[in-house]
Amino acid sequence: MTERLAPGSVIGILGGGQLGRMLSVAAARLGYRCHIYDPAPAPPAGDVAHAVTTAAWEDATALAAFAAAVDAITLEFENVPAAALDVLEPLRPV
């Protein structure tokens, strides 16, 4: 992705742990909203994010809906399954 996201854009974050929480807070200060995708109920980042999707990494339907709700996607941690990224990459910049 080479274009900058305009303020107000939604950043999708794969993983809702402490790093996702800190990223959400920093993004909000810059005028962005964050949407978390995490299989765990009530992830730490969920308290500060604009939206949360709770679904399995293998749920292609939930991943596609998540991609449709965000403008770009980033990873909170390095162990996101490659199959999940394979679903997301054709839909949004990762």
Locate each region found by the language model.
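ATP-binding N-terminal substructure of ATP-dependent carboxylate-amine bond-forming enzymes
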Residues: 1-94
